[in-house]
């Protein structure tokens, strides 16, 4: 799986329509989308999912008023439950990934037995021309999606990844473990593009909001190696407070280069996030990458608490999105906004750092990274 900073063919988004994600605060949300799309479309194509032609007409009006309508935007008329394509959409890979094309297993990802004698295999759509044993074009991993094992409205979203794969003319792969499809969200992982992946125990190994009851730590690690080309996993502990996904790593720690991560910290010992973030920092300090090298760790302070209706929201500067030539950074009108922006600017000197006010948007429990899905070149 390529790192997010590698060249993109496009960014995928879904236009907001489900007011239940932002109850009482939906009105400003389309305008936040317009700002994001205006920025992205200057740098790369935008694949925009709308529920129907009426929704497309409404979206066009907003985009036009925001000076964001562009020939670089392509509309797709697909019904969705929610807009979080990072999690419901497919995960695009580069043209060839480790594990493909074992001659003795035609048409499937290369199964490799682990210590418990289980195999990880998944069907691959075959090219029709020469009977090749592995896809030569783009690859789309279509994991199952069940709304973070929390919400009941997910069945339309579970179909979106396949529609994206077809529109991108990608070979669709259905990852499996022990003969069952794997449930996995894009926000639960982060990769360096060189063989190392970040995830959390709270999200994947907890019995609460359990995605895959049949899978153990070893099963996940084998799946990451076989399907994502990431044979080395760094496990963090708990995510940030208020995250309804139960521990997504994209609110916590992110790769910014093959050997460097940014991680959220909180110096206030009385804050609910202080202990878990400190524990994760210790794990990172003792972690090694796929080559056995120590990570360079850059700390970013959490934003001062963001609350709405007396509820602590999962505001985090880690939920940025890296696109071609630009980085979209969530800000919350908090004193630590400037520290986060300056840190990201130092880490990405060749990219424009664009702050996106997310104080209203975060009421939906997600920000820039949660709503986007990159399609690599």
Model-derived features: where do they sit?
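Intrinsic disorder/low-complexity segments
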Residues: 95-137
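The feature marks the mature, well-folded catalytic cores of soluble enzymes
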Residues: 1-97, 135-377
């Amino acid at each position: 799986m390529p790192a997010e900073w590698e060249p993109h063919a496009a960014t995928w988004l879904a236009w907001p329509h489900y007011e239940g994600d932002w109850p009482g605060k939906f009105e400003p949300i389309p305008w936040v989308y317009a700002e994001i799309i205006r920025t992205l479309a200057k740098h790369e194509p935008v694949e925009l999912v709308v529920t129907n032609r009426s929704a497309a007409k409404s979206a066009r009006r907003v985009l036009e008023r925001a000076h964001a309508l562009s020939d670089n935007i392509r509309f797709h008329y697909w019904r969705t439950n929610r807009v979080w394509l990072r999690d419901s959409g497919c995960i695009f890979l580069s043209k060839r990934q480790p594990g493909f094309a074992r001659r003795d297993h035609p048409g499937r990802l290369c199964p490799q037995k682990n210590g418990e004698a289980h195999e990880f295999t998944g069907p691959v759509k075959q090219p029709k021309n020469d009977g090749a044993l592995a896809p030569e074009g783009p690859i789309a991993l279509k994991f199952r999606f069940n709304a973070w094992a929390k919400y009941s409205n997910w069945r339309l979203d579970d179909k979106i990844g396949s529609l994206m794969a077809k529109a991108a003319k990608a070979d669709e792969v259905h990852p499996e473990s022990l003969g069952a499809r794997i449930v996995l969200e894009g926000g639960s992982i982060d990769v360096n593009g060189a063989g190392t992946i970040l995830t959390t125990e709270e999200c994947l190994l907890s019995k609460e909001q359990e995605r895959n009851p049949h899978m153990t730590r070893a099963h996940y690690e084998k799946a990451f190696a076989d399907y994502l080309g990431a044979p080395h996993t760094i496990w963090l502990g708990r995510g940030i407070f208020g995250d309804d996904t139960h521990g997504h790593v994209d609110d916590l720690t992110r790769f910014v280069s093959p050997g460097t991560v940014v991680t959220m910290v909180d110096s206030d010992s009385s804050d609910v996030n202080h202990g878990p973030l400190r524990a994760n920092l210790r794990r990172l300090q003792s972690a090694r990458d796929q080559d056995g090298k120590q990570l360079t760790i850059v700390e970013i302070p959490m934003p001062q608490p963001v609350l709405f209706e007396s509820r602590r929201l999962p505001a985090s500067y880690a939920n940025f999105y890296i696109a071609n030539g630009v980085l979209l950074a969530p800000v919350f009108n908090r004193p630590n906004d400037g520290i986060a922006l300056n840190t990201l600017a130092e880490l990405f000197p060749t990219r424009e750092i664009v702050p996106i006010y997310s104080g209203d948007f975060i009421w939906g429990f997600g920000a820039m990274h949660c709503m986007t899905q990159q399609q690599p070149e």
